[in-house]
Amino acid sequence: MKKIIFIALLCAQLGHAQDSPSGLAGKHNEVRVDLLSLVALSKYNLSYERYLGEDWSLGLSVNYANNKRVNDDFDEGNRNTIPKYEITPFVRYKLSKSLSRFYFAEVFASANGGDFREITRFNENNVGYYDIEKSDYFDVAIGAGAGYKMYIKEQFAIELLVGFGVNTIDTDKSPDVFSRVGLSFGYRF
C-alpha cells in the first residue's frame, strides 16, 4: 500500500512540474518605456502589457508631455493645441508564429487632453477687438496600429509601433488625428 501511495504522489508531482512552461510562454507581463518619444518629443510614455495566451494581449499605455519648446510655440501662436496626457488601453493580436520575433496588429481607445488656444473676436460698445483665449480640451480617440516586437534573451523587449486614430468628442478643440508612434524598450516577466 505504501508503494502505491508513493508512486501516486511521485506521478502527481511530476505531472505538476510539467504544467509551468519555461521561456517566453511562461512570462505573461511586460513593462516598456518609449525612448523615441522621450528623446524626440520630451514625452514620457510608460506601457504595461499582459499576455492572455500565445496570440492575444491586453495593455495600457500612459503618456505625459510638458515640453518647454512646444509650450513656447503654443504661447507664440505657432500651434493651436498641445496634447498633454494620454491614457490608452489596447488589444493586440500576434500575426507571426514565432514567440521571440513577431508582427502584431492592435486596436486602441485613448482618453487624451491638453491645451487649446484660439483668437476670438469680441464686441464691446460697438468696438470690435480680438483676444486670445486659452482653454483645456478632453477627447476620446479610437484607432488601430501595427508593429514589430523582438526579444533578447527571452526577457528584454524592443518594439516598433505605428498607429493612428481619430478623436471623436471635442473635435473643435482637439487634434483631428491621434498618433501612436514609438520605439520602446521593455522587460518581460
Residue ranges of predicted features:
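Membrane-helix boundary connector in multi-pass membrane proteins
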Residues: 168-169
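Outer-membrane beta-barrel "beta-signal"
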Residues: 177-189
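Cleavable N-terminal export/targeting peptides
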Residues: 1-25
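Gram-negative (and chloroplast) outer-membrane scaffold detector with strong preference
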Residues: 50-145, 150-159
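A broad, low-specificity signal marking well-ordered, structured residues that form hydrophobic/aromatic
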Residues: 15-18, 31, 105, 183
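Internal, hydrophobic beta-strand segments that form the core of beta-sheet-rich folds
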Residues: 161-164
